[in-house]
Amino acid sequence: MTRKLFIETHGCQMNEYDSSRMVDLLGEHQAMEITENPAEADVILLNTCSIREKAQEKVFSQLGRWRELKQDNPQLVIGVGGCVASQEGAAIRDRAPYVDVVFGPQTLHRLPEMIDAARTTRTPQVDISFPEIEKFDRLPEPRVDGPSAYVSVMEGCSKYCTFCVVPYTRGEEVSRPLADVLAEIVHLAENGVKEVTLLGQNVNGYRHDGHDFADLLHAVAAIDGIGRIRYTTSHPLEFSDAIIQAHADIPQLVKYLHLPVQAGSDRILAAMKRNHTALEYKSRIRRLKAAVPDILISSDFIVGFPGETDKDFEQTMKLIEDVGFDFSYSFVYSARPGTPAADLADDTPEEVKKQRLAILQQRINQQGFENSRRMVGTTQRILVSDYSKKDPGMLQGRTEHNRIVNFRCDNPRLIGQFVDVHIDDALPHSLRGSLLS
């Protein structure tokens, strides 16, 4: 009888990618099939994220809901992976002794043998080491599930921003060999993928054997069948003139960039150890917009970082106006255990943080909607991905400006194809269009 695998994923696109590779790995090595129902699973995996507040509590709360399943089925294997697993290690079992396997982002390739060992020896298996880039050599070819795919090109981060746990949970930066990345994308393209998103915690810091991220972008663009290239997440320090020129030269690169700045106050940026000023950030954006005038920019913002004053927040709002950010992942600051910022006095009242966050997000939402309204009446090329989630009589796809477009059509053969649509209306979170081709 085929064994069943259930995976719950918290957090970023890197975690989504890692979870998809776990499915590939366990499907190949243990013939497991994915299920959406944890009650019928033989193996349950929780892929965790530790970026935001109360991440650990969220993990243990979820594990508690699965405890009864373990009691009913002692053969069930429960595993915890991701960044909380890296932080907590074997200590996870202090609060959840029914967990069988604990693994980090860099050791997910060892899951088959860890699961087997947990079953046969009835002893917990813990491996949260950082074995460089070994996991990519041990993973099977990725499954193709639709016209878009994620491709991890590097792992970890060496920037050590004072608020961030990534260097401690995913290790320092390690890039995959260029040939390996390209081989994976060729495989995807040969199996119908038309759009790839290159992933890394500091993706534009990619470097391997004399090749940098701009070289990688040009090489990916040369692969037959790849019509669109996205990438995330970038660091302003690594956003070089060569990358800007690549945006001007490579038609497959979308006109949308996620380049987190976190704050607009130089004093706060220094306290965060971002190693650039607001002016330096704006200078990079100006050069990019000179090369690609209609590109849209999104960011991350942390509101209420220790010591943030009203003046600091005003400077952040000025940066938002100056750049015209289209979208943001914005959060109230919360200390992450083990980071340098956790030792700073968190002296901004919670209510003030929430007020600032609301003001910031409202303005960015306004700017994003204004950008959407400017698209009304234009023709946009979209990659059709699926039926609309709200109306089965409509298809949907995404523009190169990262807008979801829903349009009336019931022809499933268009899924996976590029089509032109006329934009008829702008809604708060999507566009409405009419098929032209």
Curated annotation (Swiss-Prot):
Residues 143-370 form the Radical SAM core domain. [4Fe-4S] cluster 2 binds at residues 157, 161, 164. Residues 373-437 form the TRAM domain. [4Fe-4S] cluster 1 binds at residues 12, 49, 83. Its EC number is 2.8.4.3. The keyword tRNA processing applies. Residues 3-120 form the MTTase N-terminal domain. Signal peptide: none annotated. Binds 2 [4Fe-4S] clusters. One cluster is coordinated with 3 cysteines and an exchangeable S-adenosyl-L-methionine. GO terms for molecular function: 4 iron, 4 sulfur cluster binding; metal ion binding; N6-isopentenyladenosine methylthiotransferase activity. InterPro entries: Elp3/MiaA/NifB-like_rSAM (IPR006638), Methylthiotransferase (IPR005839), Methylthiotransferase_CS (IPR020612), Methylthiotransferase_N (IPR013848), Methylthiotransferase_N_sf (IPR038135), MiaB_methiolase (IPR006463), rSAM (IPR007197), rSAM_horseshoe (IPR023404). Keywords: 4Fe-4S, Cytoplasm, Iron, Iron-sulfur, Metal-binding, S-adenosyl-L-methionine, Transferase, tRNA processing. It comes from the Bacteria. It is found in: Cytoplasm. It catalyses: N(6)-dimethylallyladenosine(37) in tRNA + (sulfur carrier)-SH + AH2 + 2 S-adenosyl-L-methionine = 2-methylsulfanyl-N(6)-dimethylallyladenosine(37) in tRNA + (sulfur carrier)-H + 5'-deoxyadenosine + L-methionine + A + S-adenosyl-L-homocysteine + 2 H(+). SUPFAM superfamilies: Radical SAM enzymes. GO terms for cellular component: cytosol. Its cofactor is [4Fe-4S] cluster. Catalyzes the methylthiolation of N6-(dimethylallyl)adenosine (i(6)A), leading to the formation of 2-methylthio-N6-(dimethylallyl)adenosine (ms(2)i(6)A) at position 37 in tRNAs that read codons beginning with uridine. Belongs to the methylthiotransferase family. MiaB subfamily. This is tRNA-2-methylthio-N(6)-dimethylallyladenosine synthase. It comes from Stutzerimonas stutzeri (strain A1501). The lineage of its organism: Bacteria, Pseudomonadati, Pseudomonadota, Gammaproteobacteria, Pseudomonadales. The gene is miaB.
